Amino acid sequence: MAFYTIHPRDIQNICFQKRVRVVDIRKPQEYRKYHYPGAVNIPYSDDDSWCCRFSKYRPLLLYCEYGSTSLLAARKLGKEGYEVYTVIGGANAMQEQLRR
């Protein structure tokens, strides 16, 4: 499979069309401050067991604070055969989009 980057304004469409599992990969304290409705918190870890927490049968939408860590995670999962979407600008851009 592969990974794709999406704009925050496209999250709802991807969630509806692809029935993705939304995963906030930030630390729990950041997740508690703000998270996308319905997102689960699974903090990113560079070890190989982190990938095993997900099913390859359901697309994933990952986000972190600014988009860089989720991009690394999406690349890693994409190489492992997952269909992954990551949000450009991360949670910061998602919150900004909501304010508009």
Where do the protein language model's features map onto the residues?
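Rhodanese-like catalytic fold shared by cysteine-dependent sulfurtransferases
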Residues: 1-21, 27-59, 65-100
